[in-house]
Amino acid sequence: MEKLGLNQIREMYLSFFEKKAHLRLPSFSLVPQNDKSLLLINAGMTPLKPYFTGLKVPPSKRVATCQKCIRTGDIENVGKTSRHGTFFEMLGNFSFGDYFKKEAIPWAWEFITEVLKLPKDRLYVTIYLDDDEAYDIWVKSTDVDPSKIFRLGKEDNFWEHGVGPCGPCSEIYYDRAQEKINSVEEFVEAADNDKIVEFWNLVFTQFDKDENGNYNRLSNPNIDTGMGLERMATIMQGENSIFEVDTINAILKEVCNISGTKYNEHKNNDISIRIITDHIRSITFMISDGILPSNEGRGYVLRRLLRRAAKHGKSLGIDDRFLYKLSNVVIDNSCESYPKLKDRKEYIKKVIRLEEERFDETIDSGMKILNEFIEELENSNSLLLEGEKAFKLYDTYGFPIELTEEILQEKNMGVDLEGFNKKMQNQKEMARSARTETNYMGAEDTVLNKIPLYIDTVFEGYNSLESTSKVKLMIKEGEFVSLLSQGEKGVILVANTPFYAEMGGQVGDKGIIYNENFEGKIIDCKNNVAGKILHFVEVISGSVSLEDTVLLKVDKNRRDDIRRNHTSTHLLGEALRRVLGEHVHQSGSYVDEHRLRFDFNHFESLNDKQLREVEELVNENIRKAKTVNTNLMSLEEAKKSGAVAIFDSKYSDEVRVVSIGDFSRELCGGTHVGNSGEIGLFKIVSEAGIAAGIRRIEAVTGREAVEYLYSKSDMLKEIANKFKCSEKEIVHKLDLQFNELRELRKELEEFKIKLAGSAEESILNGVKIVKGINLFTGILKDVDGNALRELADKIRSKSQNAVVLLGSNAEGKVNLVAMATKDAVEKGVHCGKIIKEVAAVAGGGGGGRPDMAQAGGKFPDKLEEAIGKCSAIMEKIVK
């Protein structure tokens, strides 16, 4: 058996099935398209689900892929075992109603025995208990040893998920131990002990299970297979661990090199090395597919992996940021099969480095807080961290809850996950209450996505804003209907339309639909997952039926404003590339009739000079009134022409290229002006960061830009009137005001310090003795925290064996400070504990060290009661 590299195996598999008339498709993005049920692609067949369910027509009836996948369900085992990982590649060959078992089984056997040349005597096969058809094909169409075919039950060899398509499967195993297996019981035991390892699963989707549990035969059965590439590589390379596979081991060796540690010498170090090795693969591919670290969704998965890897780097003694360097190894080993990695190499590294920097900024303070929590747990003989405290680490310091759990587990402690989840849910509900969520006017997504494939709409809106058409389908309240009447809302599909459906960041058109018996408003236009154009209609008068002839008319003024904004995004994108560099790629956009929003990757905010330069470059190309041309061409031709493609978008073989003179050329399906001069004026209104490495520019054009400038001019006039000066003198007047304000504040601070100082004598004279310790307390008015600390420190410095507790009411807020001398601390005084109980009375919280602590509160009227509690607290804690 020849030792084959992981990249070799991938190519051999795809080439083999290409020769069997399969269309080789590139891996889909890790970000699921039109599937809200998934955060990340987790299986080879997942992106192909619309083809299996009939929602979309497949590009070929036979397809072969190598799909990037991420699973984090077993993340706690990653690093602890030699086979668990979060990132893997899944090889698969698929048939959509074309070939079936009699082809799939012999081809699988041919590939593993004749191409990979696996020894036949080390191969086992399982089939479903009652699948005689599969057994006969294995025996008659291959030379597998019949004694090595085992029949297993539904749990092992029948694929189903609730109701819907399902079927038996056949799995192929490799024998590692070379021990004779004579029965099903021995086979199952060998599999459980990893003596034999499953590497290829052939699923025969031949039934449709109904709600009554009946299995009805499909008229067009499908084939869905999956072979784990990394697992196959361990077999072909004679290894027992995925971390010994050539491309993965290269990463592991670099981790050892960076950390100065050796593998297989120390158990805990090995766990950290394996975690980093695995996680950097997921991190690199996720960022390549446009995912960025955040606190929710797939962005949170990325942040969790990245910060977990960074934390284990610190466990290995790596103090510097290193993950961004480590991504080089992943890219170098995978870029031949995934060229996007090479194209986005610098982008990937910068995103990783930025997140490492952010983690470095928070981990020290976060670890300090966590260690304090751990100390509190140890002092109170408790093993469970409160959910509220875990949430504080997550929300304030960016500690993924899983990282907190992992650190606590090392101390044999845990987290109150129920309490944490409750706090998390409260935060989500607060965010949700700030926005409203609506569906398509009562039309359920499931119905909209079940529109028959034969119903199609021709889009005529590039050349016309009016069309005469026929009604082909209607939906009301989640059901297909034949009539829509006055006052009702619904979705209408027609044979041809001038209405642009929301896509590529451009909002859908609005307008009217009518005939002699009916009038309706089209209030939105969208695509369903299969690209069907959906008109969302409110019926104003009359009624409309299936097959009625109707006229559709787009709101021209609104469309014109949208076109100005859309063409401006193209000018803006090119201007940003010329001013900031070629690394700039669009990562999102929004275009409506009022404004445009443009998201792009860049790693720092734009300064005023850069913004001015970008804005002027756009306006220069507007003034030059450049012709806007659109051309249809092949994707290959478009790339050769230098046309810019949108970050991580998928395109068909024929694409539409929009060119603005010689300045910009971009793939785009949106609507545009015929000449850049039609835009009139472009004005940037804001620039901000929205995620790690992602900036957002908002701008207005045409009439909206003029209105924006008028509003700025009116504001300047109003300010000038208030200052009783000309507009040119405003800055000078403001400088004078600020200088005067600065002096007044300085005088006020000095006065507050004097005020606090005048109270010093009365506080010293009011000393109390509690268990042999001098207790100085005082309440001051209109004194801030700084002045309060200065006074407390001054009193402490003049005393021995003393505790100082001061409170103030400043601007309706409570400030509290506690300080203790060294000899008082030695007797058991802990200012942090004192201040915590005192602050609670005043409706606040806080903490600190044994010798100094501070806190705030919400109830000034409780201040005297709070300060008065100090004596009782000291009675408890002083030895």
From Swiss-Prot:
It catalyses: tRNA(Ala) + L-alanine + ATP = L-alanyl-tRNA(Ala) + AMP + diphosphate. The keyword Cytoplasm applies. It comes from the Bacteria. It is found in: Cytoplasm. The keyword Lipid metabolism does not apply. Its cofactor is Zn(2+). Its EC number is 6.1.1.7. Transmembrane segments: none annotated. Zn(2+) binds at residues 566, 570, 668, 672. InterPro entries: aa-tRNA-synth_II/BPL/LPL, Ala-tRNA-lgiase_IIc, Ala-tRNA-ligase_IIc_anticod-bd, Ala-tRNA-synth_IIc_core, Ala-tRNA-synth_IIc_N, Ala-tRNA_ligase, Ala_tRNA_ligase_euk/bac, DHHA1_dom. Binds 1 zinc ion per subunit. Its main location: cytoplasm. GO terms for biological process: alanyl-tRNA aminoacylation. One of its GO terms (cellular component) is cytosol. Keywords: Aminoacyl-tRNA synthetase, ATP-binding, Cytoplasm, Ligase, Metal-binding, Nucleotide-binding, Protein biosynthesis, RNA-binding, tRNA-binding, Zinc. GO terms for molecular function: alanine-tRNA ligase activity; aminoacyl-tRNA deacylase activity; ATP binding; catalytic activity, acting on a protein; transferase activity; tRNA binding; zinc ion binding. Catalyzes the attachment of alanine to tRNA(Ala) in a two-step reaction: alanine is first activated by ATP to form Ala-AMP and then transferred to the acceptor end of tRNA(Ala). Also edits incorrectly charged Ser-tRNA(Ala) and Gly-tRNA(Ala) via its editing domain. Belongs to the class-II aminoacyl-tRNA synthetase family. Consists of three domains; the N-terminal catalytic domain, the editing domain and the C-terminal C-Ala domain. The editing domain removes incorrectly charged amino acids, while the C-Ala domain, along with tRNA(Ala), serves as a bridge to cooperatively bring together the editing and aminoacylation centers thus stimulating deacylation of misacylated tRNAs. This is Alanine--tRNA ligase. It comes from Clostridium kluyveri (strain ATCC 8527 / DSM 555 / NBRC 12016 / NCIMB 10680 / K1). The gene is alaS.
